[in-house]
Amino acid sequence: MPDPATYRPAPGSIPVEPGVYRFRDQHGRVIYVGKAKSLRSRLTSYFADVASLAPRTRQLVTTAAKVEWTVVGTEVEALQLEYTWIKEFDPRFNVRYRDDKSYPVLAVTLGEEFPRLMVYRGPRRKGVRYFGPYSHAWAIRETLDLLTRVFPARTCSAGVFKRHRQIDRPCLLGYIDKCSAPCIGRVDAAQHRQIVADFCDFLSGKTDRFARALEQQMNAAAEQLDFERAARLRDDLSALKRAMEKQAVVLGDGTDADVVAFADDELEAAVQVFHVRGGRVRGQRGWIVEKPGEPGDSGIQLVEQFLTQFYGDQAALDDAADESANPVPREVLVPCLPSNAEELASWLSGLRGSRVVLRVPRRGDKRALAETVHRNAEDALQQHKLKRASDFNARSAALQSIQDSLGLADAPLRIECVDVSHVQGTDVVGSLVVFEDGLPRKSDYRHFGIREAAGQGRSDDVACIAEVTRRRFLRHLRDQSDPDLLSPERKSRRFAYPPNLYVVDGGAPQVNAASAVIDELGVTDVAVIGLAKRLEEVWVPSEPDPIIMPRNSEGLYLLQRVRDEAHRFAITYHRSKRSTRMTASALDSVPGLGEHRRKALVTHFGSIARLKEATVDEITAVPGIGVATATAVHDALRPDSSGAAR
C-alpha cells in the first residue's frame, strides 16, 4: 500500500489557481477526480494529517500512488472538465449517480417513421422521448390504456407491426379504436405523427385544450342528434379527466422545476428528485450513493456533484425540440446552495440554452413540495440501510468463508469466473463475469469468440479455457504497462486490476490449464480454482483431491452464483451467435447490398421465396435498388438462370 509521503508534491509546486486534479493508483488507473478553486489549498489538505482524514478519504490517499492536476481559467471550465473526466475514467472513489434502471418510463420512439408508445427500462437513447420515471410499470400501462382512447397511437413492437402490414389486417387495438392502425394505411405517417405529438403535448402539461376540444365535439354531436358519437366522446373525455386527476397540480404558478433533496449518514446518501413540468409532478428518481468523504465534505458538495453529473448526462442525450422536454428545467430547487452556485447556474444555463435559476425554496408550495421530497429521501435511506445490513452481513460471511476454505491471505473482493458454451463444436464462445464485494459488476462482463481452440465442428474445453484466460491476462498486462489514459483507445481499462480469485467452470484439467497460463504470463497474487458442477467440488491447481466446502456454506453459495452467472452469460451469447448464423439470408452474400436495402427488398416482396421469382426489372422497382444491384441479387438467388430473366 503506497505511503502518501512518497508521492506528495513538493512544497510550493502546486499552483494556487483553480483547476482539476486526478489521483492515480499504482497501476496508473485514475481512481479519483476533483476540482478546486485553489489547487494548492485543496491538495495540501489531503497530505496534512492522513490520520485525521475521513475513512474513505484516508483509503483514497493510501491507495493512490500519484497525483496530477490541470489548471483552468474559470470555475465553469473546472466544472466541465471534472464532469468530462469522471465520465471518461469512471473513478472508483467518486460518487456515482447511476440512473436507476429499475424505474420504468413511458417512452415515445420519435426517431421511427411511425413512433411507438411503450413501457421502457434501461439507459436513455437518442431519438426517444421519455415521460416519468413511474414507480410501477402498471401505472404506465394504466395511463396508456386511458389515453389511447383519445390518442390512438401505435403501441406494438416492430415485429407485430410488420406482420399486420403484410397480412393487411389490424390487430385487436385497431378494431376497438385504441390504435389508428398505421400498419394498414388507415392513417399516413404525418397523421400518425400528429397523434403522437398531441399525446406528448398532453403528458407535457398542455391538457386543457384537449379537454375543451373533446367537450365541444361532444356537444356538437349531441346537437346533431348523433348520440352514439356523443357517448363515445363523453367516454373519451372521462378517460382524459381521469388521466389528468393522476397528475395533481403541486405548484400553482405552473412552473417547470426539478426539486432535489438529500438524506445522508456518515457513509451514504439518498438522493430524490421530483420532476415538475407545468406545475404537475411528471416523474421521480432516486439514488443511493456512497459519500466520497472528501475533506470538508457536506451536503453542499453533494448538491454540486449531483447537479454536475445528473444534468451533464441528461443534456448529453437530449435532442428534444420543445421546451417541455428540455432535461434542464427553468428552476432547480435544492436544500442548500453550493459554494459555487453562480458558476453552477451559469453552466446549467449553457446546457439548457436559456437562464436557469438555482435556489432554496423558503415558503409556499415549493417549500411544501421540497419537504415531501426530503421525506421520500429519508424513507429511501432507511429502507436501504435495513436491506444493506442483512445483505452486507451475508456477503461478508461468504467472502470470509471462501478465504478460510481456500487458505487465502485476504478475502477475495474481486472474483472473476470463465465458462465456455457450444453445441457439438459450433459457435464456440467464452464468457467472463466479475463479482466485486460479492455483487455482480456487469459493466466488466466480457464475451469471447473462441479463435484458436475451436472451429469447423471441433472444440476442446480445456484449450478454450486456456485461450480465454490468456486473452484476459494479456489485456491486464497491457493495461498495467501503459498508464496513459488520455488517448481515446485507453478509455476502457476494466482489466487493469487483477482478480483476487479466478474461477473456472470445470474440474482439474480446466483449472490446471488456467493456472499454467497465468504462471506462464508471470501474473502473481491471483488464486485459481475450478468449480465442478456435479458434486460442487472446488479444485485447486496441482492438487490430487478437491476441497469439499459445506453444503450450507455461504462461500459455496456465492461461488455457485458466480459460476451460474458465467454459464448464463455464455449461453446467452452462444444462442445469439447461433441464431444469427441460422437466420443468415442468401442476400447476405450479395456484394454492395447493405442491411437497409436487404430489409427494403424483403419488405417489398414479403419473403425471400417471392424475391427469388422476381425479374431484374421488378427488383429494380424497389426504391434504392439500381440495375447492377438488382442483377447481382437476381444472380445470387437464381444462379442457374443468371442473365436469363429480365
UniProtKB/Swiss-Prot annotation:
GO biological processes: DNA damage response; nucleotide-excision repair; SOS response
According to its UniProt record, what is one Pfam family this protein matches?
UvrC_RNaseH
Sorted keywords for this record are: Cytoplasm, DNA damage, DNA excision, DNA repair, Excision nuclease, SOS response
- A Gene Ontology cellular-component term: excinuclease repair complex
Q: Which domain of life is it from?
A: Bacteria
What compartments host this protein? Cytoplasm
| Positions of the GIY-YIG domain | 16-95
Q: What positions does the domain UVR occupy?
A: 208-243
Q: Output the Gene Ontology terms for molecular function.
A: DNA binding; excinuclease ABC activity
Record CDD domains: GIY-YIG_UvrC_Cho (cd10434)
Q: Quaternary form?
A: Interacts with UvrB in an incision complex.
The record's function comment reads: The UvrABC repair system catalyzes the recognition and processing of DNA lesions. UvrC both incises the 5' and 3' sides of the lesion. The N-terminal half is responsible for the 3' incision and the C-terminal half is responsible for the 5' incision.
Instruction: Return the HAMAP family for the record.
Output: UvrC
What does the sequence similarity comment in the record state about its family?
Belongs to the UvrC family.
Name the record gives this protein: UvrABC system protein C
Q: Which organism is it from?
A: Mycobacterium tuberculosis (strain ATCC 25618 / H37Rv)
Organism classification: Bacteria, Bacillati, Actinomycetota, Actinomycetes, Mycobacteriales
Protein's gene: uvrC
